[in-house]
Amino acid sequence: MAITTIRMRRARSAFTFSAESSSISVSAHQTPLRMTTQYWLVKSEPEAYAWADLVRDGRTAWTGVRNYAARIHLNAMQRGDRVMFYESVTTKAVVGIAEVTKPAFPDPTADDPGWVAVELKADTPLAHPVTLEQIKTDPSLAKMTLLRQGRLSVTPLTRAEFDRIVKLGA
């Protein structure tokens, strides 16, 4: 008896097809969408929501994002992804590391259900904030989306960029 298991990239269930009985069954377990961690940077004005607020709260829904490019990034975030927390305007520095604990869901602060939020939890503060000036002058960070699309509030990071910021902040 030949049994084939098909895992669909976007599907959350595994489908099993048995050629002998021509039957299809759907398993009850959840399958991961991907096996690798992704890395992100989120920006917040400290007067609105600072790193200290996330540490105090433990976790928060990252709401209020109303930029189409940032929405694409929020939709791509998955549980376990690592997130650099950047305080903009006054601090202008990466100050901590958070983790995605809940992937994209409808933003409760939006009238349009197309806008999404993710849930983040505070993980690790950086011992030394990594300033925008440090990022701009570090050759290994020269291609960061933060530098090319400075007004974007949610941006992807490469693993190398993430690791370099961690090293600079140690």
Annotated model-derived regions:
Residues 63-69, 102-109, 139:
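Short acidic (Asp/Glu) patches
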Residues 93-103:
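Short beta-strand-centered aromatic/proline hotspots
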Residues 53, 78, 93-94, 111-113:
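Short glycine/proline-enriched turns and hinge-like loops at secondary-structure junctions
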Residues 1-34:
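N-terminal, intrinsically disordered, basic low-complexity segments enriched in Arg/Pro/Ser/Thr
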Residues 86-92:
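Short, charged beta-turn/beta-strand-edge "cap" motif at the junction between a beta-strand
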Residues 25, 29-79, 169-170:
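Compositionally biased, charged N-terminal/linker segments
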Residues 32-47, 107-170:
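Contiguous surface segments at macromolecular interaction interfaces
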